[in-house]
Amino acid sequence: RSIADDIRQHFGLCFIHVFSKSQAQNNSENIYVKGREHMKYADRYGNRWEETGLQDRFLEKLYKSVPGRAVVKVLVHPWVSRMGGWILSQKASCWLIPLFLKGHPMDESGWVKRRFTSYNDFFMRKLKPGQRPVEEDTARIISPCDAKLTVCPITEYGIMKIKHTPYTVRELLKSEKLARAYEGGYGFVYRLTVDDYHRYIYTETGKKSGNYKIPGIFHTVNPIANDLEPIYKENTREFCLIRTTDAGTVLQMEVGALMVGKIENDQEEAFVHRGEEKGRFAFGGSTIVVLYQRGQVQPDQDLLDNSRDGYETKVIQGEAVGDKVEKCRK
């Protein structure tokens, strides 16, 4: 049985299933063994495991062949993702919902029950109150979303290595002055997959800046693409600054990806609260990057160990992921 046969079978469920798993591997560590990719995961209980995805083999062929890269040049244009987002926002797209659930079984008991008006409406569904409690100890920093987390130390030269690919914070933010503020700090890279909850919250209480939008294209943020393209300095992204009293100035960024129709943030300048909903992603896997300045936070050791060894750690929205150094001193 050929890879082509596997791909044809997988496309039988519909095109969203291909992007579902391909986006489901954003930013994670990979090892190539006889043409297969092993995605490395960990949980907060000390368990580690590896998975191999068919879609990663598909993307490997797409990104690593001449014909495939010609296709990629078309797919990454913003109009393709806008078109896909428009299609998935139409009422007619509702028929895709049961197909998605067939391929991605979920516990629906925690959802707010209502009739979905489109596939994107389903994708951005709300959870019932209490389903994602926020860590009560304000001396702890929290995850903004359900995700697979990698913690990246930022060097004194502003370099942050995401998987095997080094990025400068200046490239990420398109601002040398702002980038200097995060040298020696930490970057928390949260990879959302299609089966994650795609609403996200503010990580801290403080005065929020306006939203800074950096236009770009829409590569998948799968690690195969990350090996070949500097996706985090090319993809469309949006960020804000949160000036806090106990964690410095925190930068929270949303990164778009292939087939993400749009990033929806609710507020411009405002005073915001930790745990308050910030926004949501339309269809597709995507990424949230949170940057902390030098000496402000200390990530939990298990997250540092897992990230060092190439494992992404599964976390949920509101979960504690580290300590605020200022609170620890008190």
Roles of regions detected by a PLM:
Residues 18-22, 100:
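Low-complexity, charge- and small-residue-enriched intrinsically disordered regions
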Residues 19, 32-34:
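N-terminal non-cleavable signal-anchor helices
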Residues 35-330:
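Contiguous, well-folded functional domains in the mature portion of proteins
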